[in-house]
C-alpha cells in the first residue's frame, strides 16, 4: 500500500499520523492501556493504545469493542496500525506510536515460539518462525549489510561479477569433502569453491569476484562449521601475494565499516561492542609467518591461560591455536606461508623454500578463527601438473585448468571469504548457525 511507512522510517514523521503494516511480536498492559511490540522486518517498535482515545474516535460501543479486540490480540497477528509518532527517550528505538486505529489482517493461533526460554533444537526445528525474533532479525540485517558492502567494495575497486558453476566435475580443495551426485550417468560434485573457474575469469576479464553457495561434506559439529555456506571469492591478475594481502585487509575493513554504517541498530540489538569493530578498522592487521606462529605457540604453551595442545613445525593449527594467536595480537591476523603438505595443490611455493607456499589465512580475534583463505597461484604448467599428480588427483580432470598456464600465464592471486564466519565475527555471536537463514549441518537438513 502506498500510504504505508516502514518502522525504521518513523523518525522522519514525528508528530504526524502514519500507517504501518506489522506483526504483533508481544503485548502487555492493564486497565485502559495496551502496549504492542510491533515488527515489520526493519525494526521493532512500541505502539500504545489508550481506551479513552478509541472511545473518543469511534464512540462508546465501537471504541470499547475495538479496544477489547486489541486486548486479545495473539502473538504474530498481522495488523495495520494507524497513529501519531511520538519521541520516547525511554525506548531504545527512541519513538513510539500513539494508536488511533488498528485493523487485523491475519490472525495467529498457538504460535509455538512464546516469549520464554526455548532449547536450541526446538528453535532450529522452528527456524522458519525463529527468524521473526529480534535477535535473528538483527543477524540477518548484519548479513545483508556485509553482502551489500562486498558488492560496493568490488565495484569501487574494478572487479567484475563472474558466476562459477555449482556443479563441477572436479574438486577445488579436498576430495574427501565432496558431495557427489549423479549427472546423467556420470559423477558430479557440488562446488567447494568457485576459485578454479575464477582463475579463468581473471585471465579473460581482469579482476573478478564470485558470490554463491558452496558445499563441504565435513563431519564437523563445531560452532564454526556448516555443510552449506556462502563464499565470496575474488581473483586478480598481475598481483603478488603481498599485494593480495593488502586487498584482503582493505576488503575486510570495508565490510566492518559497512555494517557500522548500515546496521547500527542491529549491532545494538545484539549488544555488540562496536568500539572493538572500530579498532579493527583503525588498526593495521598483523602479518605473522607460520613458522613464527609455531615458535610463539611453543613459547607460551605452558602459560596458565593457554589450553591448546603442543604443535610442531609441519603441524596444522586447530581452533584453540587460532584463537590464542588472534587474541595474542588483538586484531585480525594473517598467518602466512604455511607448509605445502596440507595446503591446496594450486598454491605457488615460497621462492627458495618449496616446503612452504605463498598463502595466508586471516584469523579473526575474539575466538572467531579463520575468515579468509588466500594464496598466490602456481603459474608454471609443469610444476602445477606435478602437484596435481602428487595430490593423487587425475590430471585429465584438470585439463582446462592446466591450459590456463599454456596461453599467456601471468602472476595472479586470490582469496575466499566465508560469509557466515564473517557475519558471526562482526555480530559477536557464538555459533555460526545463526548467521544463515536455514543452516545445514551434519545433523540437520530441515526445515
UniProtKB/Swiss-Prot annotation:
GO biological process: asparaginyl-tRNA aminoacylation
Coiled-coil positions: none
E.C. numbers: 6.1.1.22
Domain of life: Bacteria
GO MF entries: asparagine-tRNA ligase activity; ATP binding; catalytic activity, acting on a protein; nucleic acid binding; transferase activity
Main location: cytoplasm
Family annotation (InterPro entries): Aa-tRNA-synt_II (IPR004364), aa-tRNA-synth_II (IPR006195), aa-tRNA-synth_II/BPL/LPL (IPR045864), Asn-tRNA-ligase (IPR004522), Asp/Asn-tRNA-synth_IIb (IPR002312), NA-bd_OB-fold (IPR012340), NA-bd_OB_tRNA (IPR004365)
Catalytic function, reaction form: tRNA(Asn) + L-asparagine + ATP = L-asparaginyl-tRNA(Asn) + AMP + diphosphate + H(+)
Gene Ontology cellular component list: cytoplasm
Signal peptide, first to last residue: none
Top-rank EC class of the record's enzyme: ligase
Alphabetically ordered keywords of this record: Aminoacyl-tRNA synthetase, ATP-binding, Cytoplasm, Ligase, Nucleotide-binding, Protein biosynthesis
Entry keyword ATP-binding: yes
Cellular compartment(s): Cytoplasm
Family matches, as HAMAP family: Asn_tRNA_synth
Family statement drawn from the similarity comment of this UniProt entry: Belongs to the class-II aminoacyl-tRNA synthetase family.
UniProt xrefs under NCBIfam families: asnS, PRK03932.1
Subunit and interaction comment: Homodimer.
Record-given protein name: Asparagine--tRNA ligase
Amino acid at each position: 500500500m502506498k500510504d504505508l511507512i516502514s518502522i525504521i522510517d518513523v523518525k522522519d514523521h514525528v508528530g504526524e499520523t502514519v500507517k504501518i503494516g506489522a506483526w504483533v511480536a508481544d503485548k502487555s498492559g492493564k486497565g485502559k492501556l495496551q502496549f504492542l511490540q510491533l515488527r515489520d522486518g526493519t525494526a521493532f517498535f512500541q505502539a500504545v493504545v489508550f481506551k479513552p482515545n478509541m472511545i473518543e474516535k469511534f464512540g462508546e460501543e465501537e471504541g470499547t469493542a475495538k479496544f477489547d479486540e486489541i486486548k486479545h490480540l495473539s502473538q504474530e497477528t498481522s495488523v495495520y496500525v494507524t497513529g501519531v509518532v511520538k519521541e520516547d527517550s525511554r525506548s531504545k528505538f527512541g519513538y513510539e506510536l500513539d494508536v488511533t486505529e488498528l485493523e487485523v489482517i491475519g490472525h495467529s493461533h498457538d504460535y509455538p515460539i512464546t516469549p520464554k526460554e526455548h532449547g536450541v533444537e526446538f528453535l532450529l526445528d522452528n527456524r522458519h518462525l525463529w527468524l521473526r525474533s529480534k535477535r535473528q532479525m538483527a543477524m540477518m540485517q548484519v548479513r545483508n549489510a556485509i553482502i551489500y558492502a562486498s558488492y560496493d567494495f568490488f565495484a569501487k575497486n574494478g572487479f567484475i561479477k563472474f558466476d562459477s558453476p555449482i556443479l563441477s566435475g572436479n574438486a577445488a580443495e579436498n576430495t574427501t569433502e565432496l558431495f557427489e551426485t549423479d549427472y546423467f550417468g556420470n559423477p558430479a560434485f557440488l562446488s567447494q569453491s568457485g576459485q578454479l573457474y575464477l582463475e579463468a575469469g581473471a585471465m579473460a576479464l581482469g579482476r573478478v569476484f564470485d558470490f554463491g553457495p558452496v558445499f563441504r561434506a565435513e563431519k564437523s559439529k563445531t560452532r564454526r562449521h556448516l555443510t552449506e555456506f556462502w563464499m565470496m571469492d575474488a581473483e586478480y591478475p598481475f598481483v603478488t601475494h603481498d599485494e593480495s594481502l593488502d586487498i584482503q585487509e582493505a576488503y575486510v575493513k570495508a565490510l566492518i565499516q559497512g555494517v557500522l554504517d548500515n546496521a547500527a541498530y542491529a549491532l545494538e540489538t545484539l549488544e555488540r561492542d562496536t568500539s572493538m569493530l572500530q579498532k579493527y578498522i583503525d588498526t593495521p592487521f598483523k602479518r605473522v609467518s607460520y613458522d613464527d606462529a609455531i615458535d610463539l605457540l611453543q613459547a607460551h604453551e605452558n602459560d596458565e591461560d593457554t589450553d591448546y595442545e603442543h604443535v610442531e613445525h609441519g603441524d596444522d593449527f586447530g581452533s584453540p591455536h587460532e584463537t590464542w594467536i588472534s587474541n595474542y595480537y588483538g586484531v585480525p591476523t594473517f598467518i602466512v606461508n604455511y607448509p605445502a603438505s596440507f595446503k591446496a595443490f594450486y598454491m605457488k611455493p615460497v621462492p627458495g623454500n618449496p616446503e612452504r607456499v605463498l598463502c595466508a589465512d586471516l584469523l579473526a580475534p575474539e575466538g572467531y578463527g579463520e575468515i579468509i583463505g588466500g594464496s598466490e597461484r602456481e603459474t608454471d604448467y609443469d610444476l602445477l601438473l606435478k602437484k596435481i599428480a602428487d595430490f593423487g588427483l587425475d590430471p585429465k580432470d584438470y585439463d582446462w585448468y592446466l591450459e590456463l598456464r599454456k596461453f599467456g600465464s601471468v602472476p595472479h592471486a586470490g582469496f575466499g571469504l566465508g560469509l557466515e564466519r564473517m557475519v558471526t565475527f562482526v555480530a559477536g555471536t557464538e555459533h555460526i548457525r545463526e548467521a544463515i537463514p536455514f543452516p545445514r549441518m551434519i545433523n540437520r537438513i530441515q526445515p
